[in-house]
């Protein structure tokens, strides 16, 4: 059986251990991880899906412009969690976590995964992947226990589906890995279309 190996280096424009782990599942080990220092503020009336796509592209573009390895592909992603048209914050404080969990308790919400890949010749490919998630109704005790766990820290929407919060999920429509931080299906499809892999 033939394996696929990347024919060119790939720079992940992120320091996220979750995205590194996801890429490793499909046999991709980035040659470098370079978090992009960009302004992640929303613009007025910007829709959540547009935020995810814009931030992913800005991250990729920032690394591409400063990258000295002209044979490298750049991959960037951004995750935005939204309930209705309301964008949920990343979990920075316990107040953030309580706010998010109370808002999505018993409700459906959407995860928008912005994905941007820039090829060595500067071609930009971008896509926004949407996953719908429905949580069960959360009791005060469940919210308090989850907040005390600290799992929500730094995560979009203040929860991580790969941890204790998976027990809150009634249903998922779409890519599970998109919720974690990167749609593997879409990433692989785009890279295959760019001849990123070659058989060995």
Annotate each language-model stretch with its function.
Residues 98-103, 113-115, 122-126, 130-131:
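Anionic-ligand binding region
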Residues 126-200:
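Active-site oxyanion/phosphate-handling segment shared across diverse enzymes
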Residues 73-79:
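Ordered, amphipathic secondary-structure segments that act as subunit-interaction surfaces
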Residues 79-82, 111-118, 159:
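Short beta-strand scaffold segments in enzyme catalytic cores
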Residues 23, 56, 78, 97, ...:
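Residue-level signal for inorganic ion chemistry
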Residues 82, 116-120, 136, 170-171:
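Short beta-strand-to-turn element immediately C-terminal to the catalytic PLP-Schiff-base lysine
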Residues 51, 79-109, 135-137:
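Active-site-adjacent loop/tail segments of enzyme domains
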Residues 1-73, 86-87, 148-149, 192-200:
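N-terminal polybasic phosphate/anion-binding patch
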């Amino acid at each position: 059986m033939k394996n696929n190996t990347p024919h060119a280096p790939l720079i992940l424009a992120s320091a996220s251990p979750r995205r590194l782990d996801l890429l490793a599942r499909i046999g991709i080990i980035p040659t470098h991880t370079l978090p992009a220092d960009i302004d992640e503020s929303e613009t007025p009336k910007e829709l959540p899906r547009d935020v995810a796509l814009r931030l992913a592209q800005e991250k990729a573009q920032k690394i591409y412009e400063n990258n000295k390895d002209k044979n490298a592909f750049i991959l960037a992603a951004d995750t935005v969690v939204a309930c209705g048209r309301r964008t949920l914050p990343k979990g920075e404080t316990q107040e953030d976590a309580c706010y998010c969990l109370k808002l999505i308790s018993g409700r459906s919400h959407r995860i928008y995964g912005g994905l941007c890949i820039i090829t060595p010749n500067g071609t930009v490919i971008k896509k926004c992947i949407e996953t719908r998630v429905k949580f069960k109704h959360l009791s005060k005790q469940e919210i308090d226990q989850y907040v005390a766990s600290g799992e929500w820290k730094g995560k979009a929407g203040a929860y991580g589906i790969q941890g204790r919060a998976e027990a809150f999920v009634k249903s998922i429509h779409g890519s599970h890995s998109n919720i974690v931080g990167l749609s593997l299906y879409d990433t692989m499809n785009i890279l295959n279309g760019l001849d990123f892999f070659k058989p060995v």
